[in-house]
UniProtKB/Swiss-Prot annotation:
Protein's name in the database: Monofunctional pimaradiene synthase
Further comment: The Asp-Asp-Xaa-Xaa-Asp/Glu (DDXXD/E) motif important for the catalytic activity in the class I active site is degenetated, but the Mg(2+) binding sites are conserved.
Residue numbers binding Mg(2+) 3: 764, 768, 772
Catalytic reactions of this protein: (+)-copalyl diphosphate = (-)-pimara-8(14),15-diene + diphosphate
Task performed by this protein: Involved in defensive oleoresin formation in conifers in response to insect attack or other injury. Involved in diterpene (C20) olefins biosynthesis. Monofunctional enzyme lacking the DXDD motif in the class II active site relevant for the cyclization of geranylgeranyl diphosphate (GGPP). Requires (+)-copalyl diphosphate ((+)-CPP) as substrate, but no activity with GGPP or ent-CPP. Pimaradiene is the major products of the enzyme.
Organism of origin: Pinus contorta (Shore pine)
Pfam families the UniProt entry points to: Terpene_synth, Terpene_synth_C
């Protein structure tokens, strides 16, 4: 019978068989007077137990009882079988002179002053965030300008707005957003302005030019995509056409499109549920100026926002004020004009929207480390306005918008704020489909893309997030079938590229520098937002962000190139390159750490991680393929002694492996002593002994052609994956003094580290088991599971392993989001190790076969190719 998934994703302290009769148990938690320890018990079935405690702080290594003499020998096969298992080494990807060729002419020091200026300017933007910066709306300004003077005189109450209209007509005779031409936007704004000028009997020249523009372009509206229609266009445009008729303006009223939109409005007006129109805030509040003949203005006042507006819309608020004289409406309009002077935007405030999007931009562009305080201040502000209804685009806004809600949930969760996803249920219909606003049936590419991103930070059991993931994936794949996928609330030049990237590389396959490089290529500094009118938001779309991101990326890449050149020199001097165990994969392995732990101050962490990984890969090949049983026993003994006393008994390839490991570990330990303030050599040696014992066990399985139980294999994989070893060495160099509490959350005692190892091993197995089986490897997750479930086909077993991995990844993600009191770099090292494995084994063995997978292109983009 197939094992239930839940039985393997639950966490237990790790117990695995190592070196024949010995068992390794990693205790779930050990505390000895708050001194950080790495606590390991070695048991035998015969003569009691032995116990070794490695104290990271003191560096002492106390053997409570000796490990025992004479480990059981490994089963030996013939040298012929050993040779048969050796795989043909894939070709190297990078040329021998790569060290010189990768060194770009980029000089980071030349950019330092400009970088400092940009950082200061962006910090100033964050500090200056109030209720939101946005561009003028000619349409809304025209509505405000229509308000007559309160003293009854024949003048506008806000004469400055009328002057703005007279002074801001575009050269073609239209009004509207000048940076992007949309027929809908221009005609709606132009119609509003010529009506207002006609009402006040001024600007005859501007009116004539506006009418000429309108007549010229009215017939082309039917050619523009429906997705470019402003929100509420089908209500406000026909209403204004009727007003233009009453003013005897010479417009082409018989144009087919105008007739169609009027008919469409009449049909929609009949469908409006008048019983709920005055009881529940809806998007109708956003365009009340287009519904004046059907609404009771006195009743609608009940849905007025606390700030006096109707859904933050100056036009809608102005229309209600002219109908009711409500003083709160006037207070809101005065408030907006105090901010903007002689014009108004299409909606205001936008305080929550602006802060969330600014944080999202600097994070996705990879420059967030320069703005830690600003980000925290912005998110504290956003979270202070989170309630049981979630958040809106503005603090007083009564209508929920899924784009803001989804983005808020994702960003706040990633920053450890406690927010619930239950609010997303209000956007879901009975068929499990999600829409932009509750109870409505419109949605756009950006809405669904941000909801999809949100769904990836789900906790186990959050059904609504899983439903959102499935719904958005369907929608986005369908959107890609269009030649030019269009968005409803934004005109983005690179929306297709963003969607393709998000679908191909979900969050758990996405490394920070790849995300940065991709977003630099897709960020639109000139993107236009589409609400009731087109508008731009300068604190969200600003070329300063992009300029800093490019400079920063190239500066960091230049640092990484220098590090890679030194690592390649070390690789050649170590003797590893001559062993023919592995092709030159220094760049790929360095990429796996540099694409996540990329900050300049983590240079030592990257070097240590890369060297340790190369040692691990080489030794895995030695134990697995290139070493005899006797070779392995000799090597293990040499590592235990940690001296040169056995070198004379070693073959050259064994000697090379040992000396390289010996020198690397001693070098790392010396640097670690400086960082941690005490001797860490016993700690690091102990990690390697554990690692090599796991390699020994797997070699024993292979030589005996033994397929272990699935449970035994999975438990052993927690160590044999080598990920804990690499993380626990690398974490020494993240700038933190390691306490027992920190270690307990990321070492073998933690579920976090266990799931990192498990998911990494399963990702590896699913893409390598067939090749390794052909080389004589008999133990993999797939084969072990099939042994216990012989009724299953290989495809069914593989499908089970994929499901197991997905469940484990969900738990792992939860651990990452919930891990408390662990420094950011430590958490990231664990989390991004797991993500790196998911990416590298996405198509195949991305380390060994990088020349055949996309990994080569990723390496080039992150390490070799600067952004232009």
């Amino acid at each position: 019978m197939a094992m239930p998934l839940c039985s393997l994703t639950s966490y237990n302290p790790i117990t695995t068989t190592l070196r024949g009769h010995h068992f390794l148990t990693i205790n779930a938690y050990v505390k000895t007077q708050c001194i950080p320890c790495f606590f390991i018990k070695l048991h035998t079935r015969s003569s009691g137990s032995k116990q070794r405690i490695i104290d990271l702080r003191s560096g002492s290594s106390n053997i409570v009882a000796c490990v025992g003499e004479g480990a059981t020998s490994l089963s030996s096969h013939s040298d012929i079988m050993k040779t048969a298992k050796r795989e043909e080494i894939p070709p190297g990807v990078w040329k021998d002179d790569i060290s010189d060729s990768i060194m770009s002419s980029h000089k980071p020091e030349a950019d330092e002053k400009r970088v400092e200026i940009l950082i200061a300017e962006i910090k100033s933007m964050f500090r200056g965030m109030g209720d939101g910066e946005t561009t003028p709306s000619a349409y809304d300004t025209a509505w405000v300008a229509k308000i007559p003077a309160l003293d009854g005189s024949d003048h506008p109450h806000f004469p400055q707005t009328l002057q703005w209209i007279l002074q801001n007509q575009l050269q073609d005779g239209s009004w509207g957003e000048g940076t992007y031409f949309s027929t809908y936007d221009r005609l709606l704004a132009t119609l509003a302005c010529i009506i207002t000028l006609t009402v006040w009997r001024t600007g005859q020249t501007q009116v004539r030019q506006g009418i000429e523009f309108f007549r010229k372009h009215a017939g082309t509206m039917e050619d523009e995509a429906d997705n470019h229609q402003p929100i509420g266009f089908e209500f406000v445009f026909p209403a204004m056409i009727n007003e233009a008729k009453s003013l005897c303006l010479d417009l082409p009223y018989d144009t087919p499109f105008i007739k169609q939109i009027i008919e469409k409005r009449e049909a929609k007006l009949k469908m409006i549920p008048t019983d709920t129109l005055y009881t529940v805030p809806t998007t109708f509040l956003y365009y009340l100026e287009g519904l004046q003949e059907i609404i009771d203005c006195q009743k609608i006042i009940k849905l007025q926002s606390k700030d006096g507006s109707f859904l933050s819309s100056p036009a809608s608020t102005a229309a209600v004020f002219m109908c009711t004289g409500n003083t709160k409406c006037l207070e809101f309009l005065n408030f907006v004009l105090i901010k903007f002077g002689n014009h108004v935007p299409c909606q205001y405030p936008l305080d929550l929207f602006e802060r969330l999007w600014a944080v999202d931009i600097v994070e996705r562009l990879g420059i967030d480390r320069h703005f830690k305080k600003e980000i925290k201040d912005a998110l504290d502000y956003v979270y202070s306005h989170w309630d049981e209804r979630g958040i809106r685009w503005a603090r007083e806004n009564p209508v929920a918008y899924i784009d803001v809600m989804a983005t808020g949930i994702r960003i706040l969760r990633l920053h450890r704020y406690n927010v619930s996803s239950d609010i997303l249920k209000t956007f879901r219909d009975e068929n499990g489909e999600f829409y932009r606003f509750p109870g409505q049936s419109e949605r756009g590419v950006t809405d669904m893309l941000n909801l999809n991103r949100c769904s990836h930070v789900a906790f186990p059991g959050e059904t609504v997030m899983e439903e959102a993931k499935l719904c958005t994936e369907r929608y986005l794949w369908n959107a890609l079938e269009n030649v030019n996928p269009l968005d409803k609330w934004g005109l983005k030049e690179n929306i297709r590229g963003e969607v393709e990237y998000a679908l191909k590389y979900p969050w758990l396959r996405r490394l920070p520098r790849l995300e940065t490089r991709n977003y630099i290529e897709h960020y639109g500094a000139n993107d236009v937002w589409l609400g009731k009118m087109m508008h731009m938001m300068p604190y969200i779309n600003d070329r300063k962000y992009l300029e800093l991101a490019k400079l920063d990326f190239n500066n960091v890449q230049s640092i990484h190139q220098k590090e890679l050149r030194e690592l390649r020199r070390w690789w050649k001097s170590s003797g590893f390159a001559e062993l023919n165990f592995l092709p030159d994969r220094v760049a790929e392995i360095f990429f796996s750490i540099a694409s996540s732990m990329f900050e300049p101050e983590l240079a030592t962490c990257r070097a240590v991680y890369t060297k340790s990984t190369l040692c691990t890969v080489i030794l895995d090949g030695f134990y697995d393929v290139h070493g005899s049983a006797e070779d392995i026993m000799l090597f293990n003994e040499a590592v235990k002694r940690w001296d040169h006393s056995l070198l004379d008994r070693m073959a050259e390839h064994i000697k090379t492996c040992f000396l390289a490991l010996y020198n690397v570990v001693n070098e790392i330990a010396e640097e670690g002593r400086k960082r941690q303030g005490h001797d860490v050599l016993p700690y690091i040696r102990n990690l390697w002994e554990i690692q090599l014992e796991s390699f020994t066990k797997e070699a024993e399985w292979s030589r005996a052609e033994h397929v272990p139980s699935f449970h035994e294999y999975i438990e052993a994989a927690a160590i044999s994956s080598a990920l804990p070893t690499l993380v626990l060495i690398g974490v020494i160099f993240t700038g933190e003094v390691l306490t027992d509490h920190i270690l307990s959350q990321i070492d073998y005692r933690s579920k976090f580290a266990y799931l990192m190892s498990l998911t990494g091993r399963l990702a590896n197995d699913t893409k390598t088991y067939q090749v390794e089986r052909g080389q004589g490897e008999v133990a993999s997750a797939i084969q072990c599971y099939m042994k216990e479930n012989p009724e299953l086909s290989e495809e069914e077993a593989l499908e089970y392993i994929y499901r197991l991995m997905e469940n484990a990844l969900a738990d792992f993600k939860c651990e990452f989001l919930n891990t408390k009191d662990v420094p950011e770099y430590c958490r990231r090292l664990v989390f991004d190790n797991a993500r790196s494995m998911q990416l590298i084994y996405m198509e195949g063995d991305g380390f060994k076969l990088s020349h055949e997978t996309e990994i080569k292109q990723h390496v080039k983009k992150i390490l070799f190719e600067p952004v232009a």
